[in-house]
Amino acid sequence: MSKSLSWDTLDYTLQPWIRTAVDAMGYETMTPVQASTIPLFARNKDVVVESVTGSGKTVAFVIPVLERVIQDDANSSKLKKGHFHTIIISPTRELASQIQGVIEAFLTYYPDGEYPIKSQLLIGSNTSSVRDDVAAFLEHRPQILVGTPGRLLDFLKMPNIKTSSCGAAILDEADKLLDMNFEKDVETILKMLPKQRRTGLFSATVSSAGTQVFKTGMRNPVKVSVKTSNKAPSSLDINYIVIEPRMKLQLLLTLLNNYRYKKCIVYLPTCIAVTYFYSILQHLAKLNKMDENLKLYSLHGKLLTNSRMKTLDRFTQELGKAVLLTTDVAARGIDIPDIDLVLQMDPPIDADIFLHRCGRAGRANRAGRAIVFLNQGREEDYIPFLQVKNVEAKELDTVAIKPIEGLPEIIRAWILEDRARFDHSLKVYVAFLRYYSKHTASSIFRLQTLDYIGIAEMHGLIRLPGTPEIQRYLSKDAIPEDGWLVSPPIDLDSFAYADPQREKARKLAKKEAKDVKDNNKLKSEMRKNNEAWSKKTVTKENKLQRKEKMALKRKAIEEKLIENSDDSDNEVETDWKDIVRQRKKKKTNSGMQGDFGDL
């Protein structure tokens, strides 16, 4: 690494227009990772770069890419139609768009009259197809492609696209690209490229990819690792707050309303949680329970691409105090300069994501703070777990919660206005349990020790759902009667949807279900009656059969006796009276036998 971080100390001369761009964009000096990476990658070295979030990794590969395009004469007409020079792969559309923005910012300083350097963004969207992308590529002939794995792979498979001129491949957030979600697509893309290309892997946690890096086809790579005792940048304070689950929303509102910040990102565990809590915060704002100067935005992975990009742009350009509720779709690489506060309602499933979340604040040596909420109990072991990964977090015990009076009642009253909100609350709760069960640190985040009632109260639930987790891990004594968390229970039959069409459909479905139930009941009764009649018939038939069998048996015995009897004419008919008299006489004679001499 160069002893000085001045741009003038690079051991080769930057293109004059790039040097002008660097000064104009406010990069007064290089960061350590830029000073180490730019000379290596610009001079035909494969690199594996690991550095803390916000350390300038994007510029560290954009400058060498632009330098290489010029060095390889790819900015001339020698680059054939259908060919390209560099491919940059990113795990998310937002990050790909941001990289494209950095490249375009540099290219605004490219001298007029030169053969233009161009880049093209390739991400899935609802407004353009792969064929549209191919048509634009063939028309504008860009040298640099920036995109997400799925769309890039579809693009490269098109017959008009040729990969033989590709001289460089960049994997930004490489550890994410090499995990099971993207691994297959990324490997396929890299196999389609020339083996002699240069490859660069960049991430704050690239070491977590392990042996996967060898699947990228690098040749004698140089590892650039900016060593620090703490993986977080020095300008970023990472804190945690231990709290009862039921008080988490009150804590969030206290920080949003009272903490000094310009822009804040709130990370929630699931997409459905983002929409749910965004609606709650909007409702509280209407009731003047939120800072009146606060603007709320929401972003998650299930939104259409255009909607996501517009939301991110509006949040970035917002001049006042603003909060973005989001999922991990905005955890990696997103660089919004004014973010100085990051709040995590729950730790992420993967500990590596924790650092990426925190790194949205404190970028480019600007002061920032990241706070994670931990449930009381076993979750407190998460802090020593982070220390093993060189992430230091300090407890923030100076925050005094300023509770909004009657908040649980406000949320429940809001839910009771519309059955759809009731359904939504149950789905959010169930989704959270699924999320919690997938934590990689399963010895810390255990369903057996979760405060199910407290979590339900934080979500504003009116009734506990009958999930397997609750049935398995919550004692029967702890489960309220029929799961109701309010008293008295509400009448679900009369609980209506605010949307007339949806309510009409519910009533129709209810009537159809009742008709089916009544019909099934009638069928059951008829079946029972039919079974009773048939059983009687069978019993009667069985008796008749037994009688017939007995009669036949008796007849057979009588016939056999007749056959065995003596029918001769000499047979003497016996008089039963004579037999009786003879027996009596015999008895008398037997009593008088003997001689007087025997006495």
From Swiss-Prot:
Location of region: Disordered: 559-599
Biological processes annotated in GO: rRNA processing
Protein name in UniProt: ATP-dependent rRNA helicase SPB4
Domain called Helicase ATP-binding: residue spans: 38-224
Short sequence motif DEAD box: positions: 172-175
Keyword Nucleotide-binding: yes
SUPFAM superfamilies on file: P-loop containing nucleoside triphosphate hydrolases
Coiled-coil segments on the chain, per record: 501-561
Lineage of the species this protein comes from: Eukaryota, Fungi, Dikarya, Ascomycota, Saccharomycotina
Described purpose of this protein according to its UniProt entry: ATP-binding RNA helicase involved in the biogenesis of 60S ribosomal subunits. Binds 90S pre-ribosomal particles and dissociates from pre-60S ribosomal particles after processing of 27SB pre-rRNA. Required for the normal formation of 18S rRNA through the processing of pre-rRNAs at sites A0, A1 and A2, and the normal formation of 25S and 5.8S rRNAs through the processing of pre-rRNAs at sites C1 and C2.
PANTHER family: RNA HELICASE (PTHR24031)
Biased composition (Acidic residues): 564-573
A Pfam family: DEAD
Catalytic activity: ATP + H2O = ADP + phosphate + H(+)
Quaternary structure, from the entry: Component of pre-60S ribosomal complexes.
Principal location class: nucleus
Limits of the Helicase C-terminal domain: 248-415
